[in-house]
Amino acid sequence: YRDFKPGTVMTPREGIVLKSAMLNHPGNAVGYRLEYGGKVLTYMTDTELPADKIDPQQLALAANADLLVFDCTYTEGEIASRRGWGHSTWQEGVRLADAAGVGTLVIFHHDPSHDDAFMDGVAREAAAARPGRAPNGLPRAIVAHEGLTLSP
């Protein structure tokens, strides 16, 4: 365990770089960027992107990541009544991933009211929005599910 201030660059071991930034969530949350062996994993849970734009801190954290695990709790149809709750839509996740040059977007932090059939629909729509495969060989958009294991 180590205390740190978001924005601090840490090197817990030789060759490992860990960056962080504050996220937009009531009560605060921190996002992380892990760089190791020429690969980048960005993890952003509990964050709400500003409406119709991308937060520059989040864009920098996600820049050219092989994997972006991102809070995609809602859909665009649901977000209007949930603004200020500190969560994003999968469509916002796609926009962030595209703007940041992300290889694979991992859609996670699902709304508990979304069942498997609903999430299968999100997976189809996200795959259509980010078709093809990333340089890492993975699809450009994946919906996280129990037991999923990924390697950048």
Regions from the PLM with identified roles:
Residues Y1-P56, A60-L61, G147-P152:
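Core dinuclear metal-dependent hydrolase active-site scaffold
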